[in-house]
Design a protein with these regions (language model features):
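Short amphipathic alpha-helices in soluble, non-transmembrane regions
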Residues: 19-24, 82-90
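Ordered, soluble secondary-structure elements with a strong preference for glycine-centered loop motifs
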Residues: 14-18, 32, 76-83
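Short, well-structured beta-strand/strand-turn elements
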Residues: 28-38
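Terminal, regulation- and interaction-focused segments at domain boundaries
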Residues: 1-22
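Long, continuous compositionally biased terminal/linker segments
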Residues: 42-79
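Well-ordered alpha/beta subsegment
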Residues: 73, 80-84, 92-137
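Short proline/glycine- and acidic-rich turn/helix-capping motifs at secondary-structure junctions
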Residues: 1, 37-45, 102-114
Length: 137
């Protein structure tokens, strides 16, 4: 179950890559294969990718859109992962004057965020049930 949030420059101006790379580094993101990963206990929670083709970050990259992506089934704590993605998105939006959008690049509403959080809670419950079934087997 992929969760995707897009962050798009309000005026479609290009993000300052040096500033963005420094910002991501300060938040603990790790540059891996030309995208940035946010890890916990050496497991990827979510990643930040270039939302424009070719989808990667390089020194000469120019982009006005980035995407935050997480696979909730791979996450150790799906609900917390979504919360951290939203916190990151708000911080990024404030710093880089970006609009938080859904996977279709439509500005996101509180209702959409609540829906994603509910989906994450459902996945967390299912993971817990499967874990309990495995332990009890």
């Amino acid at each position: 179950e992929l969760v995707i949030f897009n962050l798009i420059s309000m005026d479609r101006s290009m993000f300052d890559m040096n500033q963005m790379f420094g910002f991501l580094s300060n938040l603990g993101a790790i540059n891996t294969n030309n995208y940035f990963a946010f890890n916990e206990n050496e497991v990827e929670k979510f990643r930040l990718i270039n939302a424009l083709k070719p989808g990667i970050f390089q020194e000469n990259t120019q982009t006005f859109a980035v995407a935050i992506v997480a696979d909730l089934h791979s996450s150790l704590d799906p609900y917390n992962t979504v919360k951290q993605m939203i916190e990151f998105a708000v911080t990024f939006s404030d710093k880089f004057h970006a609009t938080l959008c859904d996977q279709d690049r439509t500005p996101i509403t509180k209702q959409m965020i609540s829906h994603v959080e509910s989906k994450a809670q459902d996945i967390a419950r299912l993971k817990q049930l499967n874990k309990n079934d495995t332990i009890g087997a």
